[in-house]
Every structure is written in structure tokens, then in C-alpha cells.
């Protein structure tokens, strides 16, 4: 773990961190932070059967607290940092919008990964062919002898990779339009950006 990532983890100590939506990105990311002794809350409108028994057991073993069901967002006013899932946008969800108005930090797994990733980032987006292009680039890097990781919109969380990545590695990220909507103001952009194509919807 690089010093920058260690400083990031240290900056989160003593803060209440909520993950809204416990899907393929947020559940592993919540577990990653909880394993470092941080105060993490898992929020989802669905029950534990959706998240998965094994995942829930792992989260609880690391001290993660749950807020599930109809009123799953009720704890948000108490949080310092809110990680939203890709499908929950600030301008569409009043609870998330109110968090921003109160001055709470609202972010996402991918935004935090971009901020603190020490590796070279290759970002791939577009209307079609994202997963194929992302996978091809990853396999080409591996074949050429580079150390690389793959994830993002194709169903793999990137934040846990911060544990082991170094400046000589590559992070190959598939990015959806929903992820990019709130990433425009980030100082840290991809080292290489790939746009497969753009179609109107």
C-alpha cells in the first residue's frame, strides 16, 4: 500500500461512512474499508438475501452495520461520507441531494479510486463494446508482461485494488455514463482514455 493510500485510510478514521446500494461495487468496497477498522454502514432497500449470506457474514465480521428495507436511507443525516451506487444520482434522489446540501461528502467507489490510485489508469467508455475493449486491453497488457487489474462497470470493484497497486501497474476501468456523470470535476483523470463509440438514446 502506498503512502498516499495509507493517508487516505487514515483520513477516514473517526468518520461514519455509508454505502448506499450493496451491489458488485459497493459491497467489496465497504468490506475493504471495514477491514481497515473504519466505521462502515451498509444501506440497501432490499434484504440480506439480495446482498448474499456470505457477503453479509463477512461484512458483519468486520463490524459493518446494516440499514435495510423501506427506510434504509434514514441514517444518512448522521453520516460524514456517503458512497452512492452508480444508479443513484444526486439530482434524482432527494436523500442524496439533501446530504450534499448539508455539506456531507457524497462520492462513489470509482471517484475515490481515481483520486488515490497510484497505477496508470486506462478508462474505457462508449455506447457499445466497452466490456470487449476493456477485456482486450487488459489481456494485451498481461501478455506483454505488465502487471494489470481490471474492473469497473463490467462488475468488479476497483477500490479494493488500492491495497496492492503500485505506480508501475495498470488499472483498466470500464466506465458507464452513470459513473462519468459525477466525475467531471475530478483532478485525477485517466492516463489513457478510450471512447468506443457514441450513440443517441
Walk through the language-model features, giving the residues of each.
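N-terminal leader/targeting and accessory segments in enzymes
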Residues: 1-108, 112
Amino acid at each position: 500500500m502506498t503512502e498516499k493510500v495509507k493517508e487516505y485510510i487514515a483520513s477516514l478514521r473517526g468518520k461514519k461512512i455509508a454505502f448506499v446500494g450493496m451491489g458488485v461495487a459497493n459491497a467489496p468496497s465497504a468490506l475493504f474499508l471495514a477491514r481497515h477498522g473504519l466505521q462502515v454502514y451498509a444501506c440497501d432497500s432490499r434484504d440480506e438475501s439480495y446482498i448474499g449470506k456470505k457477503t453479509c457474514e463477512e461484512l458483519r465480521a468486520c463490524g459493518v452495520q446494516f440499514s435495510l428495507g423501506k427506510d434504509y436511507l434514514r441514517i444518512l443525516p448522521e453520516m460524514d461520507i456517503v458512497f452512492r451506487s452508480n444508479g443513484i444520482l444526486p439530482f434524482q434522489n432527494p436523500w442524496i441531494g439533501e446530504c450534499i446540501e448539508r455539506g456531507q461528502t457524497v462520492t462513489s467507489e470509482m471517484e475515490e479510486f481515481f483520486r488515490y490510485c497510484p497505477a496508470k489508469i486506462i478508462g474505457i467508455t462508449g455506447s457499445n463494446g466497452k466490456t470487449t475493449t476493456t477485456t482486450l486491453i487488459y489481456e494485451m497488457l498481461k501478455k506483454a508482461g505488465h502487471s494489470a487489474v481490471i474492473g469497473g462497470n463490467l462488475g468488479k470493484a476497483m477500490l479494493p485494488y488500492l491495497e496492492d497497486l503500485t505506480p508501475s501497474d495498470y488499472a483498466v476501468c470500464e466506465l458507464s455514463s452513470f459513473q462519468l456523470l459525477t466525475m467531471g470535476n475530478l483532478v485525477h483523470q485517466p492516463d489513457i482514455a478510450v471512447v468506443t463509440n457514441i450513440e443517441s438514446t
